[in-house]
UniProtKB/Swiss-Prot annotation:
Top EC class, one word: oxidoreductase
Pfam families reported for this sequence: Pyr_redox_2
Keyword Acetylation: no
InterPro entries cross-referenced by the UniProt entry: FAD/NAD-bd_sf (IPR036188), FAD/NAD-binding_dom (IPR023753), Fd--NADP_Rdtase_type_2 (IPR022890), Ferredoxin-NADP_redctase_2 (IPR050097)
Protein name in UniProt: Ferredoxin--NADP reductase
Amino acid sequence: MYNTDVVIIGAGPVGLFAVFQAGMLGMKCHVIDAQEVIGGQCITLYPEKPIYDIPAYPKIAAEELIKQLALQAAPFNPIYHLNQQAIELNKQDDFFEIKTSKNTLIKSKVIIIAAGAGSFGPNKPPLANIEDFESKSVFYFINDKSKFAGKNIVIAGGGDSAVDWAISLSDIANKIYLVHRRDKFTAAPESVRQLRHIAETDKIELITGYQLNALDGNNSELQSVIVKDLQNNTRKLDANILLPFFGLKQDLGSLANWGLNVKLHHIEVDSSYYQTNIEGIYAIGDIAHYVGKLKLILTGFAEAASSLHHAYSRVFDGKALHFEYSTTKNTGKRSKSVTK
């Protein structure tokens, strides 16, 4: 059995920043993640996706953000337990005991749940033969955008992923059709402004008021996408790639059985320190819910800092935290994290 100060569930960007924050406060960390590598959705779903709202980075690829966060956390020697899930929780006095799907046992004073969307998968559009085209012409995630160079692409959706990828791929695609059932997009206003600016050229055509209706092609190769409006008028879009971005299915898995207050696949927390209804267990990032919550990586970073400062007295048996700015602290030499 391992003994540590903090167990962090989730090795996405918010979980990795929590490792750094814990280290700055002198807390030892173990990190559990179901994926084979650290990085969460940033690595498994969209490593090349540009992120625009990280301070000091006008634009940074998701993969590069994870690389920098891992470097930032490395001096504190976190131990990563990858390709396994946290499945059982037992409370013993002032400690928690966590068991993973690989029978790893970890004893900890504090738990930080930074599991993002939990177990995730794409929300697929209800098209009869879509499986015939998946992985060759239909993709739900992008990990190598170069494969779309010179293609005619239909992107479906109106949120950040749909809009950001339309902008990003417009540099290399032959033609992009962005299909959305409404006239208004829910992406960041600046992204929508960029989208509409590019749409003034022939690179992106906005198909609003329409939804996906059917796919046409042969041998898993898409030839066209049929879209339909509310009056059942159809339009045929010549395309060889479909990218549906309708969000992710969320599943908390075993976390839902831990006695936490859960609402609509999110964990309810207080809005001051992001503690759950169980003292010593915190939830941060996209998995956490409170009034006024913003689902931003930046917000998750702030939640990590607040929750771990609050957890300090629990880890160190009631000792008061003497606050210091990071410029007064010595994080030590760079070292390598350990993966179990």
